[in-house]
């Protein structure tokens, strides 16, 4: 909701219940006390006391940061207006000096390397796709979480990556299917090449003495890099699947001589499954409409289901009712004959809202709607205790961390505020320092200009930085509104400053030591029907 003040005198809030110094929506209150705290070593009185302390300490700071934004923007607007009638326009150097004078450009920081530890491998060292999904929708939340593994054949057959007319409904298009298989085998030749020949000519895959053997033209051929074979299922002489690995990502070859595809394949290969959505942001912000207590309760309830491993949903597909829950882990046998498992689920981050929004699901001691980001912080972190304390079998983090993405922060002071908030929450929940990791979204102009200082402010807990065209462009337009006309959207995409923004994000991230410890993300793709364009666009990112 907006930042308007609300009071307990308003009849809308007449049924709110008193907790510590707060007035709380009965729906949210019941959810917290009977569902969130049900199996945690935290009683309701302690939770609400912690919540009240957070608001007392951080609400004034939150308001002060927003006032700083307003004052800086007013100064920038006036500076641009002052240039209109000047014969000699200000130089770039003069504009930079002005921005430093008002504190918009922060003081430089010395070179440093982030010290984040206990980040899961999915964050620290596995490169791959990251999904963003509205956590308010249980079906979408589950689909994204379960997208850790996906069929390459399906992805190619059902999208325009393959340069053929999209398959018609009502049956299998064998011509398109053949092109999918050709494309996929070429991918295998690139990712896991053979010492001789091609995967396209393979007629069998078996394991002998812990080594993968591929039959090509009646000869037994090995992988050029034998270490890329990491596991299998079934029998060694007739495996159900072969597990390969390239660039930290797994590739699973599935075999079924009776399958629709496998029966016509020389090697009996039915599908190729790729490790796909390595991480997923369960979103409480941009992709959801959560404006009141009812909405927020649903958002938090679904997050609770994910952290407890219990989230399920049902939906109708044709004439059948389909039930969906979280995928189990995937079991394999190593080349040496040892059993091991891989997560069947995407590693989850949760995006809280930024510093601007307030929400009247809880009213403070003055009857005002509270900063929603503070509420998101304490509630999502408390819920994450179920995973961090290993209270479920379908775990998220294996390192005892939780991951909060914080959007729309303006500069290092706002990042410092977030880190201080997280530190306080960690103390309240008896968590080790820096257990709550932070994703910094580089989507505001003041953050881009001060990215190194922003990362420095969170150097002990930062686990990603990323870019985003729409929000970053929007803030550029808003900030420079009085500077004159700006390019149309399509032309902005090719503007020098956008390219510089993307490149700078990567360079600064690497200079600050994010490689091997944190993610550097490259914006969101919101056009699922344009997969070919996505592949081409992402290939061009720095």
Kindly label every feature range from the protein language model.
Residues 186, 190, 422-433, 445-542:
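Active-site capping/gating regions of soluble enzymes
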Residues 5-86, 92-106:
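N-terminal-proximal low-complexity accessory segments that begin disordered
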Residues 27, 31, 35, 50, ...:
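Generic, well-ordered alpha-helical scaffold segments in large soluble proteins
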Residues 407-411, 442-447:
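Short, internal active-site loops enriched in acidic
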Residues 47, 76, 404, 440-443:
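Conserved, mostly hydrophobic/aromatic
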Residues 2-15, 94-97, 101-417, 424-431, ...:
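Catalytic alpha/beta active-site cores
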Residues 23, 42, 67, 71, ...:
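Charged, alpha-helix-enriched surfaces in structured cytosolic catalytic cores
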Residues 2-4, 10-16, 22, 38, ...:
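Domain-level signal for soluble alpha/beta catalytic cores
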């Amino acid at each position: 909701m907006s930042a308007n003040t609300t009071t307990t005198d308003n009849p809308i809030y007449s049924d709110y219940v008193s907790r510590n110094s707060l007035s709380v929506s009965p729906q949210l209150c019941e959810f917290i006390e009977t569902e969130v705290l049900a199996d945690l070593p935290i009683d309701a009185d302690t939770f609400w006391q912690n919540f009240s302390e957070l608001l007392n300490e951080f609400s004034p700071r939150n308001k002060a940061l927003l006032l700083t934004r307003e004052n800086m923007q007013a100064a920038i607007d006036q500076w641009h207006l002052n240039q209109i009638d000047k014969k000699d326009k200000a130089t770039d150097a003069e504009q930079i000096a002005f921005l430093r004078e008002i504190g918009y450009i922060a003081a430089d920081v010395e070179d440093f390397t982030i010290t984040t530890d206990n980040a899961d491998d999915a964050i620290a060292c596995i490169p791959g796709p990251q999904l963003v999904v509205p956590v308010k929708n249980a079906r979408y939340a589950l689909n994204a979480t379960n997208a850790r593994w996906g069929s390459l054949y399906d992805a190619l057959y059902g999208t325009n990556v393959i340069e053929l007319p999209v398959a018609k409904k009502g049956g299998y298009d064998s011509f398109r299917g053949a092109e999918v298989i050709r494309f996929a085998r070429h991918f295998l030749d690139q990712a896991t090449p053979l010492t001789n020949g091609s995967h396209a000519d393979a007629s069998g895959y078996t394991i002998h003495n812990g080594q993968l053997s591929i039959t090509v033209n009646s000869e037994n051929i090995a992988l050029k890099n034998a270490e890329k074979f990491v596991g299998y299922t079934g029998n060694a002489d007739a495996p159900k699947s072969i597990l390969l690995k390239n660039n930290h990502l797994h590739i699973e070859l599935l075999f079924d001589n009776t399958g629709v595809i496998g029966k016509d394949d020389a090697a009996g290969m039915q599908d190729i499954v790729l490790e796909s959505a390595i991480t997923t942001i369960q979103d409480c912000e941009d992709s959801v409409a959560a404006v009141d207590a009812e909405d927020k309760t649903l958002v938090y309830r679904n997050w609770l289901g994910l952290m407890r491993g219990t989230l399920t949903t049902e939906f109708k597909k044709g004439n059948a009712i389909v039930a969906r829950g979280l995928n189990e882990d995937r079991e394999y046998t190593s080349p040496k004959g040892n059993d091991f498992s891989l997560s069947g689920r995407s590693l989850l981050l949760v995006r809280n809202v930024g510093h601007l929004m307030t929400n009247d699901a809880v009213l403070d001691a003055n009857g005002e709607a509270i900063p929603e980001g503070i509420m998101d912080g304490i509630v999502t972190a408390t819920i994450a205790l179920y995973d961090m304390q290993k209270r479920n079998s379908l775990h998220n983090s294996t390192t005892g961390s939780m991951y909060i993405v914080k959007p729309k922060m303006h500069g290092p002071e706002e990042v410092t505020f977030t880190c201080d908030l997280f530190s306080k929450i960690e103390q309240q929940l008896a968590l080790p320092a820096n257990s709550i990791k932070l994703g910094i979204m580089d989507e505001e102009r003041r953050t881009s200009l001060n990215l190194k200082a922003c990362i420095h402010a969170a150097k002990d807990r930062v686990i990603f930085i990323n870019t985003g065209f729409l929000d970053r462009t929007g803030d550029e337009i808003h900030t420079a509104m009085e500077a004159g006309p700006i390019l149309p959207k399509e032309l902005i995409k090719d503007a020098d400053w956008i390219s510089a923004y993307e490149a700078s994000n990567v360079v600064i991230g690497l200079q600050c030591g994010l490689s091997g410890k944190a993610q550097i993300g490259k914006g969101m793709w919101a056009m699922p029907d344009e997969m070919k364009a996505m592949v081409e666009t992402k290939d061009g990112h720095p």
